[in-house]
């Protein structure tokens, strides 16, 4: 499993996750062009990305999602509670690319488990598991709960 934090903070959040040939971005809070530049800087073409996973609706997490998904025809995955706040913000994401889930799901050999995070809007962290490796990504954590630990 390979994880690269491309951006973190109030100016934008983007994390690259790769496992068994599947490549995802968790949030795209930068512009499409800036995200593309940061991917290129670490030797990754945006054409290699298989999808986008969204933690929540704030602009520092979704700023580039609409254009990036549209430009590269990528699916966008988000928990059903998160999609409620995204419908009016992600108008360029094709209907067939809107992937709504309410629990653990699998993509290839990767198992993705969402867990709710305390925040002022519906927000989720994700645990990514593949074979004997696991990593969790949590952003905008209001406070640590027993569930998160």
Predicted region positions:
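Conserved beta-strand hairpin/beta-sheet module of binuclear metal-dependent hydrolase folds
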Residues: 1-42, 124-139
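Metallo-beta-lactamase
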Residues: 79-132
